[in-house]
Amino acid sequence: MSDTIPILKRIDTMKAKKVIAMLLVATLSVTAFTGCTINKNATVATLDKEDIKLGLVNFMIRYQEAGYDDMYIQYMGEGYWDKTVSGNNTVLETWKKNAIEEAHELYTLKAHQSDYDVAVSDDEKKEIEKAAKKFMKANSDDVIDEMSATQEIVEEYLKLRLIKSKMYAAIIKNADSSVTDEEANMAAYTIVKLDYKGAYDSNYQYQTYTDEQSAQIKAQADAVVEALAGGSSLEDAAKAAGTTATTGTYATYVDPDVDKTDDSDKKSDDTESTESSESSDSKTKDSVYTTNNLDQSVVDALNSLEEGQTSDLITTDSTYYIVRLDKKTDEEATESNRKTVKGNKEDKYYNGILSGWQDDEKWSVKQKQLDKIKIHNYFTTTKKDAKAADTSATESTQQSESTNSTDTQNTEAVDGTEN
């Protein structure tokens, strides 16, 4: 079984103001500066006749790193970027792949601006220029060098993100994103889950149980079943057996357009309160729309129950489950899911338009140049500034609902002092 920690995905629909706020409202320090710089002007990819510079892609990667360092180091330790966390790829390899794909997307959208009458206004250009200057002035040479930041690179990235924000909004206006009650429906349940093959420890390493440990867990499951037969509630039965019952919601809609054999492009909308994703040994088929956090056998059992009914013991190849259907429709979760499904439809439409454009493009990547991007040290962000960045980004997003102009008034200087 692989030691897997989910890689955080970039937010594709981030508002332009939020982009700028998150870029600038944080205090960064870079540790152990190595002085290993790259050729910022080298071409790392080409879209038709436009060259994408290595410095921009490195900036995108190091900017992402700066946002994740504190959290990843806490869970994975220093040097986490060289650890394998997703299949056979390291964190850095995954970031490189994401960055080059994002660059492809951004430059494709830039090339099709005129299709949707999208442009960056003179006022927006001035605000972006001012924001980039402030960023360059506020940071130490070490931080600037590590991120391969230049006035031109920072401005280019902010312009590309602004164009994407505008293009996404323009494209999805043509999407059919209506959501039926059936599509939105979320049912509520209570569950007892007992893994009998093994579990992840505090270091995210999977530990296989001994036969004795597995037998003890089977005894727990049997004790829950026995207590239920005696009239106990699922909560009381779980407590008496030395475990807990937790609650959650799941989407009941079966999407006929989803390939049941491939869930790589699906998004999880389940909001189970304390349950984590199933291990790779689970029999998760994901044939129901957004059931990534529930084994298919659990979904099938829930769908067969009436409100208040409890299932028999469900056994998969790694886990015992007992579930109770609490509500066929959880109103609050359903309304929240309605927004999620709407967003999924908009994303699907947007991705379809984007893919169509990219199919007609000539896109090439110079892997040898991409391989030159290395990480030898990390950035740290103070708690105070991290909170300020989140607050400013939230405020900027709210403000951007009423205007397309960028906002840099609430930004703070970035400190590049070495630790």
Listing of model-derived features with the role each one plays in the protein:
Residues 31-35:
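C-terminal motif of bacterial Sec signal peptides marking the signal peptidase cleavage site
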Residues 38-40, 47, 143-216, 280, ...:
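PPIase-associated folding chaperone regions across multiple families
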Residues 37-148:
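N-terminal targeting/tethering segments
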Residues 24-29:
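Hydrophobic helical h-region of N-terminal Sec-dependent signal peptides
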Residues 62-66, 100-119, 130-141, 159-176, ...:
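Sec-exported extracytoplasmic/periplasmic mature domains
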Residues 1-13:
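Short, Lys/Arg-enriched N-terminal segments with co-localized hydrophobic residues
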Residues 12-22:
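Bacterial N-terminal signal peptides that target proteins for export
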Residues 219-294, 332:
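Peptidyl-prolyl cis-trans isomerase
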